[in-house]
Amino acid sequence: QQTPTGLATTGLETRQYGTSTTSWSTNDNVKHYANGGLDAWDPTRYLNIWVCNLSGGLLGYGEFPTASVSQTFGVVIDYPCLGSNYTSYGTFSGIQAPFDRGRTVQHAFSHCFHIYPLWGDDNGACSGSDLCADTPNQGDATSGCFAYPHTDNCSTTSPGIMFENSMDYSDDNCLNLFTNNQKTRMLAVLNSAPYNALQTSNG
């Protein structure tokens, strides 16, 4: 692993002092040193992730891909939602249940690879789309962890909605899958310029 200047690195950069900001919003200030955050490393060579005290009840957010890579490309994660308490490394008191299995990062980075929310952002109208034919129509985000099958106003009969899909807002212990169409969309981004450079990066 190397920094943009070729030095050995763990991939971690921290900034705890020299800023009066105690929480951050979705205005991307956390992605700029001049605004109290940290500048991105070359986004064609690194997948950037900013971890901070994110305000407004948000767990995290990701930036969608564009024809030319934005210098802010990456994800922002609220610090209690980073990491997992279910690995061989043990448990960490700062990670908050029920978002303690790393699914927030997984969900946010999926946006970077062109995956949309299951419900199509149509406010329950059942007319929106996530552009994946193999995900059931869904009215809105879910929370908690339902028993299977679970129906809603857009998928009224069994098997209902796919609340286990990583692009829903269910608890981390529920989120365990992507569909083939979602995989195809992600690979299409990763295999196309300029994002394909990430596959051969020495970062």
What would you call each of these model-derived segments?
Residues 1-145:
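Metzincin-family zinc-dependent endopeptidase catalytic domain
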